[in-house]
């Protein structure tokens, strides 16, 4: 009987700790989404620039006019580069 009680209390304690940690992690991720550090923004900018340039170059190789790939999140393709709208 004591073993069952100890096991039950241990599981309850682990569950409480896990739930608390998950709530803290969720709160941190929401804060990070609101104010992203400059290093993360720079990485996103470089990635969008690369994707846009590569997309336009691939389309130019087919001897057709470059139909620029839509850049997402308030960005547009201009001169083979993604620029903020």
From Swiss-Prot:
Name of the protein described by the UniProt record = U4-theraphotoxin-Hhn1l
Q: List the disulfide bonds.
A: 52-66, 56-77, 71-82
Q: Which UniProt keywords apply?
A: Disulfide bond, Neurotoxin, Postsynaptic neurotoxin, Secreted, Signal, Toxin
Subcellular localization, per the record?
Secreted
Write out the GO MF terms.
toxin activity
PROSITE patterns, per the entry: HWTX_2
> Span of the secretion signal?
1-22
Q: Which SUPFAM superfamilies match?
A: omega toxin-like
Q: Do you know which InterPro entries this protein is assigned to?
A: Hwtx-2-like
Question: Main localization of the protein?
Answer: secreted
The protein's superkingdom reads Eukaryota
* Keyword Secreted among record annotations: yes
> Propeptide residue numbers?
23-48
Task: Give the protein's biological function.
Answer: Postsynaptic neurotoxin.
Q: In which tissues is it expressed?
A: Expressed by the venom gland.
Q: Which GO terms describe its cellular component?
A: extracellular region; host cell postsynaptic membrane
Q: Which organism is it from?
A: Cyriopagopus hainanus
Query: Which family is annotated?
Result: Belongs to the neurotoxin 12 (Hwtx-2) family. 02 (Hwtx-2) subfamily.
């Amino acid at each position: 009987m004591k073993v069952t009680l100890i096991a039950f209390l241990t599981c309850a304690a682990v569950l409480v700790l896990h739930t608390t940690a998950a709530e803290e992690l969720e709160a941190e991720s929401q804060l990070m989404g609101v104010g992203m550090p400059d290093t993360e923004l720079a990485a996103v900018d470089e990635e969008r620039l690369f994707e846009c340039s590569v997309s336009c170059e691939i389309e130019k190789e087919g001897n057709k006019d470059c139909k620029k790939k839509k850049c997402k999140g308030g960005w547009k393709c201009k001169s083979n580069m993604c620029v903020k709208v």
